[in-house]
Structures are given as structure tokens and as C-alpha cells.
A protein has these predicted regions:
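N-terminal leader/linker segments that initiate helical-solenoid repeat arrays
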Residues: 19-70
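Short coil/turn linkers that connect adjacent helices within long alpha-helical scaffolds
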Residues: 58-61, 97-100, 137-140, 176-180
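Conserved small/polar residues in nucleotide/adenosyl-binding loops
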Residues: 202-209
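Conserved alpha-helical positions within TPR/SEL1-like repeat arrays
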Residues: 31, 38, 67-78, 106-117, ...
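Eukaryotic all-alpha helical interaction scaffolds
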Residues: 49, 56-57, 95-97, 115, ...
Length: 209
């Protein structure tokens, strides 16, 4: 009897392992799809990210689940669902491993962006500063530049145009050093709103973050 129970346990464990691997592969495929559609179809990206997140248990930390949830929140904020996005970002924190500094910084950066959309600029700047510090500590210059650009956008909407320009210039300097053409274009677009220290208020488009 004891031998039969051991055999049954081995069979169950053997059956569970491939299923877990299949779920992980499926989650990664869904995450890839979410990233693909994020900017041109955020509604579809939100769907894929939510499906990926649902593959994981609610009570277990998982960096892959955290990645899916961050994508979901990013898609929802692009859709204008800021309250839903910020709620889920807070829920995401428990799935991030304490040693994964990059993922925590990504979370803080996105939270800062959403708080900015909600008009809470003090909280937005606090989170942006935290994200910037973490990215600096791990040597991720590209993400530091991204934080500077987002910070510039925040100050633009606070009508602090001189400060905004300074952060856009910092982002541009990093992106030029790395020859990141896409982000250079974004920085230059934002800087085109300015002439020296004077904001071109007439018919100027909003800066991009």
C-alpha cells in the first residue's frame, strides 16, 4: 500500500512539472504579444497581459507574473484607466523579488507616470526619483534617461518650464552618448517646445513621455 502511494505521488509530480513549464511558456508568449500591441492597440495588450497574469497562483511571488501585471497596468494607463492602473501597480509589488532592483524601478517609474496623469505631482516626483536612483545603482543609463524625460514632462504640466527643459537636456545627453535614435527623437520633440528658457505656449503639442 505504501509503495503504491509513493508511486502515485511520483506520477502526480511528474504530470505537474510539464504543466507548470507549459504555463510558463504560454505566459511568455502572451507577454510578448502584450509588448507587441502595447502602443498601437493597448486594449489588446491589456487582454494579453491579464491572460498571462491569470496563469499564476494568487499567493505566490513570481517575477514573470509581475512583468505581466506591469504591462497590464501600462496598457490601462494608456487607455486612460488611471485608478485601475495604480491599484494594480500596488498589487504588483508583492510579486517582485526584493533582489530584482530593475523590476522594482520599472514599477516605481510607471507609478510615477500614473500619479502624474492623476495630477498628484508630488507623489509622481517622489516615485520618479526613487526609480532614477535604483536605475543609477544598477548602471541602467537608458532607463535613467527615460526617467529624466518623464520628469521633464511632469514639470512641463506643472508650468515649471525651465526645470522641464533641464531634465529633457539630461535625457538627451544620455541618449546621444548611447546613440539611441528613437529616444533622441522623443527628447528633441520635447525640447522643440522651448526657445531658450521661454516656453512656446501657442499651439504647442504636449511633450511625450
Amino acid at each position: 500500500m505504501k509503495k503504491n502511494l509513493c508511486l502515485l505521488l511520483v506520477c502526480l509530480l511528474s504530470a505537474a512539472a510539464p504543466l507548470q513549464a507549459q504555463d510558463m511558456q504560454q505566459a511568455q508568449k502572451l507577454i510578448d504579444q502584450a509588448q507587441k500591441y502595447l502602443y498601437n492597440n493597448p486594449k489588446q495588450a491589456s487582454y494579453y497581459a491579464a491572460q498571462a497574469s491569470a496563469l499564476f497562483p494568487e499567493d505566490e511571488p513570481s517575477e514573470v507574473r509581475a512583468q505581466a501585471m506591469i504591462l497590464y497596468c501600462q496598457a490601462e494607463q494608456l487607455l486612460g484607466n488611471f485608478d485601475l492602473s495604480i491599484k494594480n501597480l500596488y498589487d504588483t509589488q508583492k510579486y517582485i523579488h526584493p533582489t530584482n532592483k530593475k523590476q522594482m524601478a520599472q514599477l516605481c517609474s510607471l507609478m510615477g507616470r500614473v500619479y502624474s496623469k492623476l495630477g498628484d505631482y508630488n507623489k509622481a516626483i517622489e516615485l520618479n526619483d526613487k526609480a532614477t536612483s535604483i536605475f543609477k545603482s544598477i548602471g541602467d543609463s537608458t532607463s535613467v534617461a527615460g526617467c529624466y524625460n518623464k520628469r521633464g514632462v511632469m514639470h512641463h504640466f506643472m508650468s515649471e518650464f525651465t526645470v522641464a527643459e533641464r531634465f529633457f537636456q539630461r535625457a538627451l545627453a544620455i541618449n546621444r552618448a548611447q546613440r539611441n535614435l528613437k529616444e533622441i527623437a522623443t527628447n528633441l520633440n520635447n525640447l522643440c517646445l522651448y526657445r531658450g528658457n521661454t516656453c512656446l505656449l501657442y499651439t504647442s503639442p504636449s511633450p511625450r513621455d
